[in-house]
Design a protein with these regions (language model features):
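A very general structural signal that marks isolated residues within well-ordered alpha-helical segments
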Residues: 70, 169-170
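Short, conserved secondary-structure transition motifs
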Residues: 143-157
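Conserved small/polar residues in nucleotide/adenosyl-binding loops
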Residues: 163-169
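Residues that scaffold, gate, or flank divalent-cation-dependent active/transport sites
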Residues: 1-108, 113-115, 120-130, 139-143, ...
Length: 173
């Protein structure tokens, strides 16, 4: 009997892409979302353009503004971000009935028994990537036998958008 198959979906720019969808702002201009931490404003989400300029999550807005003076800055709205992710989670149930939010910028999806409906695991993942792309969301997907492995692949794999891992069975070990 085949084991469970889990997909972890990470939206690395979710905070800024939510803003970009709402404001119809130019994709080429660096965008950051900032949160108040103590006496300073810290970047909580960046756009791909901001990352290209050398900005990173956790950086102070003061430092980021010195590096990139033409930043488009928005204040973080945690409630709106949470509701946005919950909406994506509900929408994603068209791929699998077992979808849950993971943190503030990811989903976990159990695709055991579902992938054949899309023509196999690889085709299902391609379908998911294209669907999120149509929504204007950047995604990295990891697929593995366990939640932890899928999560790690989605965040730390060197591939651009999709990584895949099948753990050896006990018979193979």
């Amino acid at each position: 009997m085949p084991g469970r198959r889990i997909i972890a979906i990470w939206f690395p720019y979710m905070g800024t892409e939510r803003i970009l969808r709402k404001t119809q702002h130019s994709l080429g201009k660096p965008v950051v979302v900032v949160a108040k931490k103590s006496q300073s404003e810290i970047i909580s989400s960046i756009s791909a353009a901001a990352q290209y300029k050398g900005l990173f999550v956790g950086q102070s807005l003061r430092d980021a503004s010195a590096i990139c003076p033409n930043l488009f800055v928005q204040t973080q709205n945690s409630y709106a971000e949470t509701q946005f992710l919950k909406g994506i989670c509900r929408w994603s149930s068209k791929f699998s009935p077992w979808v849950a939010t993971e943190g503030n910028n990811g989903l976990i999806m159990d695709i055991t028994g579902c992938s054949h409906l899309f023509g196999g695991e690889d085709k299902m993942i391609t379908h998911i990537l294209l669907a999120y792309d149509e929504l204007g969301l950047t995604t990295k997907i990891g697929c593995a036998d366990t939640v932890g492995a899928a999560w790690a692949l989605s965040r730390y794999s060197e591939t651009v958008s999709y990584t895949h891992l099948t753990l050896p069975t006990t018979e193979a070990v």
